[in-house]
Design a protein with these regions (language model features):
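C-terminal motif of bacterial Sec signal peptides marking the signal peptidase cleavage site
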Residues: 19-20
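Glycan-processing catalytic domains of CAZymes
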Residues: 24-365, 371-399
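Bacterial N-terminal signal peptides that target proteins for export
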Residues: 1-9
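Core hydrophobic alpha-helical transmembrane segments of single-pass membrane proteins
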Residues: 11-13
Length: 399
């Protein structure tokens, strides 16, 4: 596999634009944002693909049945500036011939193998992956999505961390992805979710691989309708832990009645729902701040607050250049990122019930990165701030 080529493919969404603002980063970058369960073959029109692009997605992942459907998707996506995560029945039965037909298409992002596999399937997936890689010449990444950590070990056949480690070692894909939707009608499943995030961060970092994570955009049992607060909580937490790609489940409303799927961004009536506009707003905000996260390295990740959840690390020392940091009992995720000579202190709310009060002081000049990506200089001394429900505060300063 061409490792440098694959890495650039994973960050294919990145565009470099020089800016002239004093003290601003040297370039603006784009996060990969993928629509899971996207436009079906029977609704594949240029208008629908433009609608997807207008919502802020730059990778389309439709569950397509045939190679013909896939080629149609690629052609439409190209016209609206979107890439495609490729899947079809023939990719598994005849990988050589499928890859030969699509590998040079400008809209191809990568190839999808399987959703939520258990350990016994890893040898087969590895064999299949090598066939695709060989046919593709290592030009595009291969992708699958892992189970969350609350799945019974009888399904995984080993403990969760070991299953992630085995996936990385045995299947040998250039990225790690997992899904966990922490917001239910009963609240936030904080213990499991943060522990899951920590495991994925640890194992992907140890292997030198990027990881991708999810937000839930479609209500179904036992998950409520998304809100801006729930989307921010899920996505900014993932980015604070080092995620390099983001995904929404789902974009198009699934037809099955088993899980009571409803009010997807494109809902059961094939119309835009309120979720469409929430996701659109969220994606604009994410891309405005993408320069903070794309290619950043996690220096440290910890938690403050009355409760330190399972698998999380309590903050034992202040991040670099931070003189004091206080929150209320609700606490926050405390992540220090570094990139291009900058530190980014990322503080993410852990509650959807109320704003989080924050007091923070630094020993150096600091700017706060707003939702529009603009940097606003903080006054010297202690700053008393409020982080909205599920929201984030981002501080930038020189190393």
């Amino acid at each position: 596999m061409k490792n440098t080529t694959i890495l650039s493919a994973i960050l294919l969404m990145t565009s470099i634009v020089f800016v002239s603002c004093q003290g601003s980063p040297a370039r603006e970058e784009k996060l990969p944002i993928m629509s899971w369960y996207s436009i079906p073959a029977e609704d594949a029109t240029l208008e629908r693909y433009q609608e997807l692009a207008d919502c802020g997605f730059n990778i389309n992942f439709s569950h397509l049945g045939s190679l013909e459907d896939l080629r149609t998707s690629l052609d439409l996506a190209q016209q609206v500036g979107v890439k495609v995560m490729a899947t079809c029945r023939e990719l598994e039965t005849s990988p050589d011939s499928v890859v030969a037909l699509v590998k040079d298409h400008p809209a191809l992002y990568g190839y999808f193998l399987r959703d939520e596999p258990a350990c016994p399937s890893f040898p087969y997936l590895a064999e299949w992956a090598r066939k695709i890689e060989y046919a593709d010449g290592g030009e595009h990444p291969l992708y699958l999505n892992l189970l969350p950590n609350f799945v019974d070990t009888a399904v995984l056949t080993c403990n969760y961390r070991e299953s992630v480690r085995r996936f990385i070692a045995e299947v040998k894909l250039p990225m790690v992805s997992f899904d966990y939707y922490p917001v239910t009608f009963g609240g936030i499943s904080s213990d499991n979710w943060y522990d899951n995030m920590q495991v994925i961060h640890d194992e992907s970092e140890a292997a030198g691989l990027p990881f991708w994570a999810f937000a839930l955009s479609t209500a179904h049992d036992p998950y409520p309708l998304p809100t801006m607060a729930s989307l921010r909580l899920e996505l900014y937490t993932a980015l604070a832990y080092g995620a390099q790609g983001l995904q929404y489940f789902t974009y198009w409303n699934p037809g099955t009645e088993v899980w009571n799927f409803h009010e997807a961004p494109i809902n059961q009536n094939k119309e835009r729902s309120e979720a469409y506009y929430l996701v659109q707003q969220m994606n604009r905000e994410l891309q405005a701040r993408a320069f903070v996260f794309v290619g950043s390295k996690v220096v440290s990740i910890s938690h403050v607050g009355k409760t330190i959840f399972r698998g999380c690390k309590a903050m034992e020392e202040l991040p670099a250049h931070v003189v004091s940091l206080e929150t209320g009992d609700d606490g926050a995720v405390v992540s220090l990122l570094e990139k291009d000579g900058w530190y980014y202190l990322v503080l993410v709310s852990r509650t959807l019930e109320r704003p989080t009060d924050l007091k923070v002081a630094f020993d150096t000049r600091v700017h706060m990165i707003g939702p529009d990506g603009k940097a606003v200089r903080l006054p010297k001394g202690e700053n008393a701030l409020s982080i909205g429900e599920g929201d984030v505060a981002i501080f930038r300063y020189r190393k």
